[in-house]
A protein has these predicted regions:
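Outer membrane beta-barrel
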Residues: 16-156, 160-196, 269
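Cleavable N-terminal export/targeting peptides
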Residues: 1-16
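Short intrinsically disordered, low-complexity coil segments enriched in acidic
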Residues: 2-3, 269-271
């Protein structure tokens, strides 16, 4: 199978700023258009074009150190909550609370607006996770970034029981070389989670081709189901190299699931 992809991104913003500079408000929005053509393909997947993601949101900065953001998204024929959080920043230190991605995985940390590759990697899609409600501490300087957070493992629509489980995630990023023309970025991360009753009974990892053209149901080429889970660890490492317009990105993620009455599961992905 060979897949030819293209991506068109449309971004719009509107700003309002106070004369004293202590208040700033902006509306944000974007739409991602994806197209794909499959050839030399034995699976007979269809060609097509889709609007893969639409976002509409607003963000505000106030009282010098406070920022807030609310964003909704439309994808797969439904509206969903995206980033909804408040941050307090003082110098290199920041506290963050709300609904957002935990500190895990390179593409999830960047978000679709800042993807350097055309789509999210298969590794991130399989071993990453969705946004969760939680809080975190972040230290960010020119040379290093460290972060740690505690998150609920439940869904924001609260359709499941209240025994949701939890996630603890931490990450360290070092930039030994960083200027306008050169960057060396080295990151490591760890994540521990305990889950609700339904996920303890069965959890799955699945992935497909790196494209938004196919529906989620048909774009599954690898699937692993694990039963009788006790808890789960995930580990990650990533590297970014940049030199005068040349960009290289690589990442390795691994998941280890401890099971009751069965062999533990370990899965890995790299690109």
């Amino acid at each position: 199978m060979f897949l030819l992809l293209f991506l068109l991104q449309i971004i719009a913003q509107a700003f309002v700023k106070s004369s004293t500079g202590d208040f700033e408000w902006k509306m944000t929005g974007r739409a991602l258009f994806d197209g794909g053509i499959f050839f030399s393909d034995s699976s007979r997947l269809g060609n097509g074009m889709v609007i893969s993601d639409v976002r509409l949101g607003t963000s505000v900065r106030f009282l010098k150190n406070w920022e807030g953001k609310i964003e909704l998204g439309y994808r797969d024929s439904k509206v969903s909550l995206k980033d909804i959080y408040v941050t307090y920043r003082r110098g290199d230190h920041m506290l963050k609370v709300g609904h957002y991605f935990e500190h895990w995985g390179l593409d999830y940390r960047l978000g679709s607006l800042r993807f350097r590759l055309m789509t999210m990697s298969v590794t991130d899609a399989v071993f990453g996770d969705k946004r969760k409600v939680g809080f975190s501490y972040i230290y960010n300087s020119r040379a290093i970034t460290t972060s740690a957070g505690f998150f609920s493992d439940g869904d924001t629509d609260n359709i499941k029981s209240l025994d949701e489980g939890y996630v603890i995630a931490a990450q360290f990023i070092g930039r030994p070389l960083y200027d306008e023309e050169k960057l060396v970025h080295l990151g490591i991360g760890v994540r521990y989670s305990e889950h609700d009753k339904a996920e303890r009974e069965e959890i799955s990892f699945k992935g497909g081709a790196p494209t938004e053209v196919l529906s989620k149901n048909e774009n599954v080429f690898v699937r692993t189901r694990i039963t009788n889970m006790i808890n789960q660890w995930r580990f990650g490492a990533d590297v970014i190299l940049f030199y005068r317009g040349t960009y290289l990105q690589s990442e390795c993620l691994a998941a280890h699931v401890n099971r009751a009455g069965g062999e533990n599961y370990t899965g890995k992905g790299v690109y």
